[in-house]
């Protein structure tokens, strides 16, 4: 892949920022591709939470220019028999474990299983494939190397299960907003409806956070087109005791027929 601008490599991990792990990965990438521009998507994915990592990666990936390399490591199976993957689509390239983390990016992508050679041609450390396997592969892609030079093509990369039809909380963001899997366009048209979260009924829909009354949970359309449960000047997740995976209900309210006056 030919490039005129410096290559961009994003990083998404569950490593946190207290330790040196992220810096070691960045150092490895820059050692192999000094011109790379490194962008952190998140390093605060809950440890081993593949589903959360896939959600965050998928949401951010669409904002980057074509040719960006997305490096993602949420890898509770590191050192086991899961494969390491690199993928390429018309918009991006991606590197990560074959555990579903890259699943949202694999549609229409060519995928290879990485050859298990470390950054110095030897075997990678069993506990740190992020540094010794994935980072060098991402750097090679950023340099413009062809995908097939990294491994053998596969067609059975692990993909996530189909999105559940049951309304649920997909993600709780930094502000305590609960991002749901509810697409407002799929809510029955006509009449009134509300979202039931446990014992809490949420029916007030607002366009902006500033429109929300303080202290009252509201429904708002998020920037990714999904319905969110929010609380102005507070954390909806804490107040409503909601977490990722919690089920919700969308309830259509029946219209009340007008009262008929009795004849006197």
Task: Enumerate the language-model features and the residues they cover.
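Conserved active-site and cofactor/substrate-binding residues in soluble primary-metabolism enzymes
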Residues: 20, 24, 33, 48, ...
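Anionic-ligand-binding alpha/beta catalytic cores of soluble enzymes and soluble regulatory domains
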Residues: 121-182, 186-189
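Generic C-terminus detector
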Residues: 226-264
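Active-site histidine-anchored catalytic micro-motif
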Residues: 32-38, 50-55, 65-67, 71-74, ...
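A conserved acidic, glycine/proline-rich C-terminal tail/linker
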Residues: 179-241
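N-terminal glycine-/serine-/threonine-rich phosphate-binding loop
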Residues: 1-81
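Structural motif
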Residues: 7-10, 36-39, 68-71, 84-86, ...
